[in-house]
Amino acid sequence: MCIRDSVKTEAEAPDFAQWQTALNAIMPAGIHVTRVAPVEMKADSIAFACYCISYPAAAAAVLEQYNALETAPVEKHSKRGKKIVDLKEHIPQLRYTALGDTVQLELCLPAAQELNLNPSLLTGFLEEKFGLPAASANILRTKFLTADRQLFV
C-alpha cells in the first residue's frame, strides 16, 4: 500500500534510514515502510491514485462482461452529496493479467479535490451488477501521480 504521511522535526539532518528502521519495528505484521524521505511535492498536486486489484481467476468472465458494457453508472457519496458517475468514463476497459489462480488488473483513478474515485466503487459495481463478491478483491494502492502523470514524491 502506498501511504503518504508527514511529520515535523527540529533535526537539521534527520537520519531517514533510522526512522525507517524505527517505524518498521512498530508496524503491524505484513506492513513495511519502504521509503522515508523529505517532502518534495504538495499534497494538492496529487491527481491520480493507482491500484493493483486481484481477484480469483474465475472473475475473468465478469471483467469481460464489464468490458462489454457501454456504461457503468454508480452512485458516489461525498460531503457535497450524492452524484452519479459513469465508471466507463474513467475505466473504459479492465485490462487484466492471469497469474496462476488469480487475475490482476492495474488502474489509476482520479484522486483530486474535484473528483476522487475509490476502487470500491468498481468492486461494488461488479458485485451489484454481476454478483462478483467485492470481498474477493485484494486492493493495493501502489502510487500517486500528478496531473501530468508524473510520480508524486
Language model features by range: what are they?
Residues 7, 49-51, 94:
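Broad hydrophobic/π-residue packing in well-ordered secondary structure
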Residues 1-5:
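Conserved small/polar residues in nucleotide/adenosyl-binding loops
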Residues 68-153:
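Core RNA-modification/binding signature centered on pseudouridine synthases
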Residues 15-74:
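RNA pseudouridine synthases
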Residues 13-14, 60, 98-102:
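Short, glycine- and charge-enriched coil/turn segments that flank and shape catalytic ligand pockets
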Residues 7-13, 53-59, 107-113:
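Short beta-strand-to-loop capping motifs
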Residues 12-16, 117-118:
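General structural signal for secondary-structure boundaries
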